[in-house]
Swiss-Prot record:
It comes from Sodalis glossinidius (strain morsitans). Keywords: Cell inner membrane, Cell membrane, Electron transport, Membrane, Translocase, Transmembrane, Transmembrane helix, Transport. This is Ion-translocating oxidoreductase complex subunit E. The complex is composed of six subunits: RnfA, RnfB, RnfC, RnfD, RnfE and RnfG. It is found in: Cell inner membrane. One of its GO terms (biological process) is electron transport chain. Its EC number is 7.-.-.-. The gene is rnfE. Part of a membrane-bound complex that couples electron transfer with translocation of ions across the membrane. The chain crosses the membrane at residues 12-31, 39-59, 69-89, 92-112, 125-145, 182-202. It comes from the Bacteria.
Amino acid sequence: MNEAKRILLEGLWRNNSSLVQLLGLCPLLAVSNTATNALGLGLATTLVLVCTNTAVSALRRWITGEIRIPIYVMIIASVVSAVQMLINAYAFGLYQSLGIFIPLIVTNCIVIGRAEAYASQRPPALAALDGLSIGLGSTCTLLLLGALREVLGNGTLFDGADQLLGAWARVLRIEVFHTDTPFLLAMLPPGAFIGLGFMLVGKYLIDQRMKARQPKAARPVVLQQGQPLADE
């Protein structure tokens, strides 16, 4: 398995930042009330991860170990500010919906963790790919949880997609079933905790099934003291 494929597989599944490392749970639980909000924040976080990892990797030779963390935070804050202005300019409805959680990307453990653990020790191309894979893994988790909560809570899917993608995206709205009274448990943070719990269980079961399908490695035979060999 080459390095690029391993990085993608690690970020998307094996070492998923939300389902394995359990990082970034604050925005995961607070913003995933709709699929649109989840997708918007996930894409913003992915863009920040790619840009931050690339910048940290490119500057790693000139960043001394004693002051590396403050410099990483400054780089992350600069990128997040640029992304925030882009969302404000081109997706103002989404900007209002996400609110404080866009600037809070600066304090996201996923971003600073990848800058410290991976980007500071790898070339820019691999660092950018790592940021992309980690970001897409987090986005997929956000999107799945947001879609689950939106369907159970409001009976819709991608409601308000025009806030993210423009007026044409109104056609993406799907009404799975009609309801006059939203299911508040699914829309509130307790529903996010419950949904995340089911997703963790689902990933565990899938991993166990995949492990069971793998051929068992030959186990070495350990002879006890005094036990004769088979050919003796």
